[in-house]
Amino acid sequence: MSYIPVVIEQTSRGERAYDIYSRLLKERIIFVCSTVEDHMANLIVAQLLFLEAENPKKDIYMYINSPGGVVTAGLAIYDTMQFIKPKVATLCIGQACSMGSLLLCGGEHGMRYSLPHSRIMIHQPSGGYKGQATDIEIHARETLKIKKLLNELYSKHTEQALKHIEKSMERDNFMSPGEAKKFGLVDNIISSRDAMALLHK
């Protein structure tokens, strides 16, 4: 069972306790730091919508350390990022693989960052299906549709030709932050808070 630190703050009404993630949410910081699946995606979407309702003009910061996960769950987060009014800055800490890399590059252009020792990985979607031959065929067609959609999204956010994206995603494609910047997945590599602040001036 994982332990989540609690922060105690003094208020006019006395002490108030927050878990660390809730306290950071007050600073408009959202963490995507586990496997992307439906439950966590719903929580991330809810946080994005809450921060938009609180202040639609103030930026949101999404910190990503994820191995990827379920495509539809990731697309729920991605679509919400594009839907809401605030700009969403993304920052890779550790890893942004598979759907994690789509969320990373889906941040506001010019506000997509990576720390210097992170790893980023893109690849085509995978699926393993059992059952009747007709059902397997249906799922295979759906996987190909999702592959085409993801290729188009990566092409849009990296400004790379679709053919180049298709070739680059045929197998697991691991990148350093420098390679990810050259590819168009991130805009800047930062090593300090001050460096990030300078880029926002």
From Swiss-Prot:
The active site is at S98, H123. The keyword ATP-binding does not apply. CDD domains: S14_ClpP_2 (cd07017). Its main location: cytoplasm. One of its GO terms (cellular component) is cytoplasm. The keyword Hydrolase applies. Keywords: Cytoplasm, Hydrolase, Protease, Serine protease. It is an enzyme of class 3 (hydrolase). SUPFAM superfamilies: ClpP/crotonase. Its EC number is 3.4.21.92. One of its GO terms (biological process) is protein quality control for misfolded or incompletely synthesized proteins. GO terms for molecular function: ATP-dependent peptidase activity; ATPase binding; serine-type endopeptidase activity. InterPro entries: ClpP, ClpP/crotonase-like_dom_sf, ClpP/TepA, ClpP_His_AS, ClpP_Ser_AS. It is found in: Cytoplasm. It catalyses: Hydrolysis of proteins to small peptides in the presence of ATP and magnesium. alpha-casein is the usual test substrate. In the absence of ATP, only oligopeptides shorter than five residues are hydrolyzed (such as succinyl-Leu-Tyr-|-NHMec, and Leu-Tyr-Leu-|-Tyr-Trp, in which cleavage of the -Tyr-|-Leu- and -Tyr-|-Trp bonds also occurs). Cleaves peptides in various proteins in a process that requires ATP hydrolysis. Has a chymotrypsin-like activity. Plays a major role in the degradation of misfolded proteins. Fourteen ClpP subunits assemble into 2 heptameric rings which stack back to back to give a disk-like structure with a central cavity, resembling the structure of eukaryotic proteasomes. Belongs to the peptidase S14 family. HAMAP family: ClpP. This is ATP-dependent Clp protease proteolytic subunit.
